[in-house]
Amino acid sequence: MLWIDKYKPTSLDKMDYHNDISINLKNMIKSGDFPHLLVYGPSGAGKKTRILAVLQEIYGPNALKLKIDHRTFKHPTSSKNIQITTISSHYHIEINPGEAGSYDRVVIQTIIKEIAQSPPIDSGSLGAFKIVILNEVDKLSKDAQHALRRTMEKYATFCRLILCCDSTAKVIDPIKSRCLGIRVPAPSQEEIEKVLAKVATAEKFDLPSKLAVNVAKQSGGNLRYALMLLESQKAKQYPFQSTELPLLDWENYISQIVKDCFEEQSPARLSIVRGKLYELLGHCIPPELIFKTLLLEIFKKLDHNMKFEIIHWASYYEHRSQIGSKPIFHLEAFIAKFMSVYKKYNQ
């Protein structure tokens, strides 16, 4: 079992940081007034861990007895079959509607209707409703979000929604106004170091403080990434020979792309870079992460006077990538713009 699963807290009392959030959630549950929730924050901050702890607080340990199903839904007006993966207990169901693509509206309406029509039998007055957890709600189509707003009003008596996303910027206002927003910030570097030390003690190995600092720094506030990085380092070399951390394969690949861009600015070089960007996307590296890592790598070699313009174009094309459906077009456009600006600046 991976450390991120083995040492994941299962109750609000066992959380390692953001105790104020845990206290507020416990008080809200005890009051008996449990609204729809919109839980948001950066990746690896602990959003899902807290959501599962909320389920345990409401329903007890049976809420954590999970099963994975592969569900098939039929489109009401066509013969199209829609397949998604669900994680559920007797008290809740968790789905990522984005798996359904443009049919996300159908999946949301069907799931919520099913759940609302079968309230839990043995939950008592504290949880006389079932919970639907929707992941990556910010990536839902506008049509699906409006359908979600109507559905959450209709079935509010026997169903509560917990919406989870990294940012609320793309969530429509009618949904935000019907949910209690809970922001889960990224843990600080010191908090990540404490968790790493705690895991090292439980696993009975010596963790050099310098290595813990480097892992926490490289994680960028992502505790999940920090734990996986430490676990991989221990598997590769223990006792630790060095406290330095090698780059991941995809990070090395992006470093090579940036090197290519600085060496030559031409259509031929752009074509080579495009192929490498395709490789990254083909290996499921998120386009947002590619944009961010590209920019950070470019900044390491860039003159201060150019940084503001490059930031502008990176944010411009990243925004267009969010709106569009073909990230490769916008990644390539950003690289082309960078080559143009860099070549013009050095003439």
UniProtKB/Swiss-Prot annotation:
SMART domains per the UniProt record, alphabetical: AAA
Keywords: DNA replication, DNA-binding, Nucleus
Keyword DNA-binding: yes
GO biological process, one term: DNA repair
Pfam families: DNA_pol3_delta2, RCF1-5-like_lid, RFC_C
CC terms in the record's Gene Ontology section: DNA replication factor C complex; Elg1 RFC-like complex; nucleus
Subcellular localization: Nucleus
Coarse class of the protein's main subcellular location: nucleus
Alphabetized InterPro entries for the sequence: AAA+_ATPase, DNA_pol3_clamp-load_cplx_C, DNA_Rep/Repair_Clamp_Loader, P-loop_NTPase
Subunit structure: Heteropentamer of various rfc subunits that forms a complex (RFC) with PCNA in the presence of ATP.
Family statement drawn from the similarity comment of this UniProt entry: Belongs to the activator 1 small subunits family.
Its job: The elongation of primed DNA templates by DNA polymerase delta and epsilon requires the action of the accessory proteins PCNA and activator 1.
Stated name of the protein: Probable replication factor C subunit 3
Organism: Dictyostelium discoideum
Gene name of this polypeptide: rfc3
